[in-house]
Amino acid sequence: MNLTLKPDLRGKVAVVTGGAGVLCSEFVRALAQCGAKVAILNRTLSKGEALAEEVRQNGGEAMAFSCNVTDSESVKAAHEAVLAAFGKCDILINGAGGNNPRANTDKEYFELGDIEAATKSFFDIDEEGFRFVMDLNFVGTLLPTQAFAQDMIGREGCTIINISSMNAYTPLTKIPAYSGAKAAINNFTQWLAVHFSKVGIRVNAIAPGFFSTKQNAALLFNPDGTPTARTGKILAATPMGRFGDSEKELSGAVLFLLNNDAASFITGVTIPIDGGFSAYSGV
């Protein structure tokens, strides 16, 4: 990874929830390159350990810790383990999140006759699936913040970054739970920024647009490599006309927000990184 922005994070302890995920693993690599000790919190420990080993092989310092961000006892145990291994947390990236098909609709629009049709409409959304998405994204941001922000109180240069989405501004069709959860993240980021403003903790968020990754490749491209119909709609609604580069264009924004020389007066904001998607009216 070639970083164009490289703040000095030596001596800092960075905690990344969902750290072995497709996007958050890029944050882990970037943080380690900047000199931070990185705690990779991941529900599947083996994935976190594989990433930590990769970081160490490249000269960085990282350890993996098992953590279910929706379970307070699991989060507390992870916090204690990180304290014992690395010391107090300086940087928290609340990266754990995701969607669940049980919380989706099959169609973009509800039409006459859909009640009787063999399709999943708004009225068929599974309650437990909806709760799962809200818990994973919103409660999964609340609980780690409650645990790790305690380490930051009254200390210089401590920062929390939440992961929102362009869904937070205008919800995408078919995914109401995920869109609602990310809208809540924007509001919560503002609340936290005000709440912690007197004790030296900055709180911001990034709102990624569409990035082509292995995780979403099947949704964006057909087996022959041609774009799906949904990809065509996405790119048509993205003024820059392309997908983002997670290595450069997400990690760069995160490192900027972590840079206390450049961003020390920035708190309570959510930065869209979406090629203009959230700004475009469609005409």
Give residue spans per PLM region.
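Catalytic Tyr-x(3-8)-Lys segment
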Residues: 124, 128, 226-248
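Active-site helix of classical SDR
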Residues: 145, 181
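Canonical Rossmann dinucleotide-binding motif of NAD(H)/NADP(H)-dependent dehydrogenases/reductases
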Residues: 7-39
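Substrate-binding pocket helix/loop in short-chain dehydrogenase/reductase
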Residues: 103-122, 126-131, 234
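C-terminal substrate-recognition "lid" of short-chain dehydrogenase/reductases
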Residues: 243-273, 278
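Alpha-helical segment proximal to the catalytic Tyr-Lys
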Residues: 150, 194-195
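Residue(s) in the substrate-gating loop at a strand-loop-helix junction
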Residues: 165
